[in-house]
Structure formats: C-alpha cells, structure tokens
Amino acid sequence: MPDVMKRTPASVIRWLFSSEDGASDRLLPRWFFLRGLGLIYFSAFYSLVFQIKGLIGPNGILPADEYLRELTKLGVVRFWYAPTLLWFSSSSHMLNAICYVGLIAAVLLVLNVWPRAMLALCFACFLSFVSAAQDFSGYQSDGMLLEAGFISLFFAPPGVRPGLGGDDPPSRASLFLLQWEWFRIYFESGMVKLASGDPQWRDFTAMDEYYQNGPLPTWIGWYVQHLPHKLHTFATGATLVLELVLVWMLFLPRRWRIACFFIVTLWQVPVILTANYTFLNYLVLLLGVLLLDDRFLQRWLSQPLLTRIDDRTQAASPDRTAPEEDHAVRAFSHINALKLAFTSVMLSWIFYSTLVQMLWIPFGRLPLPTSPVIALEPFRIANRYGLFAVMTRGRYEIEFQGSNDGETWMAYPFRHKPQDPTKAPGIYAPYQPRLDWNLWFASLGAWRDNMFVVSAEERLLANDSDVLSLFASNPFGKNAPKLVRAVIWRYWFTSLAERHATGMWWRRESLGLYAPTLTHMPDGKLGVVEWPPPAMPRP
C-alpha cells in the first residue's frame, strides 16, 4: 500500500475500487478463479435441471407459484423480499429456462466469453431459484456461491474475449472481498463451534461419529470412521486450529499466504472424499486460489499455455484512447465516475454487512446500524457462515412408503441418501440432491417444522411424475398407492467384523412413524389415517 496514506480521498477510492490501479499481479489467479466459478455454476444448474420441477414446479413439493402468490400480499415489497425472475412466470417452461440459460452462461464463462455478462446471467438465474425455493434453498453453499458470484461481477475483466485482461487488472477491493469471503467461511465456522457450547468440540470428540452422521456420507468415510480414536481427536483439534488460527496467514506476507493455501487445500481433500457437501468444498478451494499470485503460477505453467490463455488479450482489450470530441470526453468521464461510485458503494456495503455479522458471533447484537445488513439479506450476497456449530448425535433417515392395504408397505428408493443397508454410500459431489439433503435436516426435528415432508406425501399419493423423478424408481408403476406414510430409522455404520461377515454397510432400527399417514377419502379429499407420536424418540 505504498504512499496510500498520503493520497487524497478521491485517489484512495480509485486505488481501492478501480481496475486502472488494480492488483496487476493477480491476473492468472483471476483467470483460473473465473473458469472454476463457471464450472461450479454449471454443477449447480446441472443439478437443478433434473430436480427443479419436482421441487418447486406447478406440481412439485413446494410450488413456487403458490409461494409467490402468497407474497403478493406484501405489495411492492415482495420484489425485494423475493428477488426472482419467476415473478414473470413460474411455469415449468420458465423453470427450465432459468436452468438452461444458467447452464449456457456457465459454459461461456468457462470459455472466457464476455465474463461479466455471463456472471450476471448466472447470478440472476441462480438467485431466481434460491429466492423461490423456500425450504430447498436454506443451505450455506447457496449463499457462498451467490456472494462469490456477485463480487466477481466487479472482479472480472470487461470485454467479449478479454484473455487475462491485462489492461483491466482486478480492483483491490473486489480481490480483498473474495479473499475475505474465504477467510470468513473458515473463521466464522471456528467461532460458532466455540460459541455454541457443544461439548463435543470442547472435549475433542466431535469427529468420532462425524463421518457416519453427516448429511450424505461416502464409502471412504466408512473406512475413516474405523480409524483409531486418537486420529479423530487429532482431526478435531486440527480443525479448530486451522479455522481459528491458520487462516490468519492470509493477512501475512506473500510466503505465509502461499503456505496457507497449500495447508488448507490439503485439508479439504479428505473432507471431499469422506462427505458429499455438494459444490461447497470446491468453491472454498477455488476461493483459496486467490491467495496465490502471477509470479507463483508462472513458475508452474508452461509458456505455450500462458500464451494460449492470453492469446486474445490485445485484440479484445477495450480502447482506452480518449475520444476526440469534448462532449464525448465528458460523457466518457461521467460514465466512469458513475461506475466507480457504484462499485465503491456496493463493495463497501458488502464489507460492512459481513463484518457486522461476523462481530455478532462472539459479541452478540452490537449497537451498530443494521439496516444495511437487512437490506442485502434477500440477495444472499453478504452472508454469515458457520459450519457444524453443533455436531449431530446419531444418524436418522426418513423413508417414504406406500401401500394399497395398510399391511404391506413398499419403500420409495432414493437416488443418493442412505437407505438400503447393503448399498455402499457413494461419491457424487458437486451434484446436489436437494430433497435428500432436506430430509437429513428434517430427520433431526419434528414433522410440523418440516411440512415439505407432508407435501411430498401428498404428491406421491397423486403419483406425480415430477416428484417421482426425484426418486430412483416408483414401486407402484402407473397406479398410485392408496396410502403414503413417512417413517424414520436410526442408522449406524456396521463394524469391520459385521461388514466382513454380512457385506452390509449399515445397521438400522425402525423408530416408527415420522409424519401423518395420508390417504384419499371417499369424497376425494385428503385424510389422515394415522398420526405420529407427539415427540419422536431419539435414543
């Protein structure tokens, strides 16, 4: 930050927020980051292509049109509360459109075609889903992607084929905010672990059953679960040290920052292999690339590759020569001033909102202005993070079953989450099966707090094809069952001896009914055949 304290306020703003005075040593990290961000957006939209109609379609579990119709009671405020393109239409065609437009934009972003415009399309399409998805969009990974995607609008180079964008290096503020997001994901996760008071983090037993009890485990996690207890104790302590201490290396000189990148990257690899956290870990890894610089990456990349990356830079660089006419010069200057003002306000706003939310974790609600924080909440671009504040005790799984006589029940097989004890848990991240994920969260609470489970029962009772597409198969074929229920099981990894003797990956025990058993009454209305107990047993 040479001589920055001696500058005028206007020059400091330009130094922070304009690309002309930007971080010219981060062209390669920016190039790789934006290509990777395109891949992550692609994975998010690809997952939605196969699920969106079953989740929020007109015949889905939580129809977007019903939700938005209810929000019309808010008046014009509804457009702020739910910023989504689905206000124009929430038909199946529109849902498919936002997925495929997002997919195409993500591919073009990967190909470095008009990156700013493609980032805007990806952000608008993904925000449109998240804002209307209700229970199916409460994940921290969604907020992480939207925050990174929005800041990248200011981080990316202009132009249709900008190459490395050497004439438009990333502004220091946009680079810092992306690094700041990376830092907060780790540090806030560490803080919430201590602030929650969960004894498992304090006595270093948090990792003892982590691989079994997480949302969607993998077969590698099964093996890691059976490692000696001392290794799990070490992993617990190392997690806290990494999240609370090591990430501060971001703010140290260059060599420390690069060392931090390698430590954190190596730590993420076993996390990816032992659990399916959709695109979350890949996005965190990608944000970490911004800890590197051109000098480091140039040592590892061949000259032909560097030339290929930047082969269109000169041809696509914007013309910076000043127009000859005075009025054009003034117009050009005014436009640049407005762009700089908007960038300065927007990025400062995001930083303030995220800083305030981070301070709330250890200090509670400080007497600071909260209106700026609240104003950005619906857009998910200034978030508070905190992964695994409290470790789950036990693994519970909800299963949908149908019957024609009330005696013989057949289960609807899931595509991804644990169900069949003989089936090995798979590895499929960054794909995100949102129904499977939500059922894991629902299993930890009561059905009345997770009404999407009852909605899913209704759609299965109607044999709806959109909702059935979320499952591996339909045990009832073309004829709808007469009764549908949701039951709950407790699951455990089998021991090494049990696995060797039986070939099973899981043991499970039935805990009974989770949600009401539904049927169609003679008059065609929905009826309840059996109610679950008031409180679910949690052994």
Language-model regions, residue ranges each:
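Alpha-helical membrane-anchoring segments
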Residues: P2-P539
